[in-house]
Amino acid sequence: MKTTTRSNIYLPMAAMILTAALAIPAAAQTQVPFKGTFQGNDTTIPPTITTAATGIGTLLGQLSFTQEVTANFANFTDAGSAHWIAANGDSIYTTVVGSAIPGDVVFTVTEIHTITGGTGRFSGAQGSFTVHRTHIVAPSADGTHVTFGSFHGTITSPTAAH
């Protein structure tokens, strides 16, 4: 009889502890807005386009990012990876897929960044965001192309909101 009573008490207690343990990570993984603006330069050595830019964004503060994509100039698409660096050095790593609408003076570029990892407070980060940017067709004196734009989406990270 005592064994049955103990089992009847321990089972609900174990269920409560397990529920609480599983709820803590779920609560810590809250989605938060991720947005900002940037400007920089694109260096094109076909088929590779390398972007280096600086800007400001939520969760990142002052930021820098580098991106390297392989472009398909026949259909104006690209794919590659990017590295976003926050003011304190914490990083977000993404894969990139995008497309461009060509024009005589500018290309209008839209890219989807999917978070693949991070460091510091972005360790364990997940999510995606969209980059909308303008690429100036005429090169600058140094041979690079000016680019500027914005990004918006959501990020889920155990410590991103802190």
Where do the language-model regions lie?
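Bacterial N-terminal signal peptides that target proteins for export
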Residues: 2-14
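Bacterial N-terminal signal peptides
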Residues: 12-23
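Beta-strand-enriched cores of mature, soluble protein domains
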Residues: 27-162
